[in-house]
């Protein structure tokens, strides 16, 4: 077969544009492509909910790729092993209660699990605001290309509609911080966006399932963003809580929308 460059270009533009347009109206929009949101996306999509992840960077996976200090291994507790099993991620016991997995394999299979279930992922998309309606309830997101932000270009964004939004942007809790800053009187949780405490893995992991919840009408938090909003400690390269948080936020949303 003789290849034609323009046909290649048209195939990419047309096929992506169809999907991008289709996902301007979704059930669940997850902001941030870290492990918690990847896990959530799989379960949400399997439940038949139209699910999309927007990732600001080129690669999804958040901080999981590099393990701890660029040693590509992560630790997972026994409580979360069933999630590794469901995604087909291999692991072994290091010592009692501590299980080790390859961080690169883990991210690859989390991505595969989410997309194979039917979730869509758009990378290099920056979520710069939320869309609101009556009573300042969130009804979608305001998006632009990450390149626009990096280049400091004056380019108006576009908007997508979503029944619920999940802030899975990690330490900065970008969506929650935006809502608190831009919606007069908005209070996320009891104290607003507090910011994470210093590292205390045991406490941070235990608190994560309590902090994973709806914090503002139609806005949920998962993963490190949940602890950042609540003022709970950071956990470091132990990922059991992240995985469980993703599953929990999916279950909360499925119970509501499913």
UniProtKB/Swiss-Prot annotation:
Glycine binds at residue 234. Fe cation binds at residues 156, 171. GO terms for molecular function: iron ion binding; pentosyltransferase activity. It catalyses: hydrogen sulfide + glycine + NAD(+) = ADP-5-ethyl-4-methylthiazole-2-carboxylate + nicotinamide + 3 H2O + H(+). Keywords: Iron, Metal-binding, NAD, Thiamine biosynthesis, Transferase. The keyword NAD applies. Its EC number is 2.4.2.59. Pathway: Cofactor biosynthesis; thiamine diphosphate biosynthesis. It is an enzyme of class 2 (transferase). Its cofactor is Fe(2+). GO terms for biological process: thiamine biosynthetic process; thiamine diphosphate biosynthetic process; thiazole biosynthetic process. NAD(+) binds at residues 36, 55-56, 63, 127, 154-156, 224. Belongs to the THI4 family. NCBIfam families: sulfide-dependent adenosine diphosphate thiazole synthase. Homooctamer; tetramer of dimers. Involved in the biosynthesis of the thiazole moiety of thiamine. Catalyzes the conversion of NAD and glycine to adenosine diphosphate 5-(2-hydroxyethyl)-4-methylthiazole-2-carboxylate (ADT), an adenylated thiazole intermediate, using free sulfide as a source of sulfur. This is Thiamine thiazole synthase.
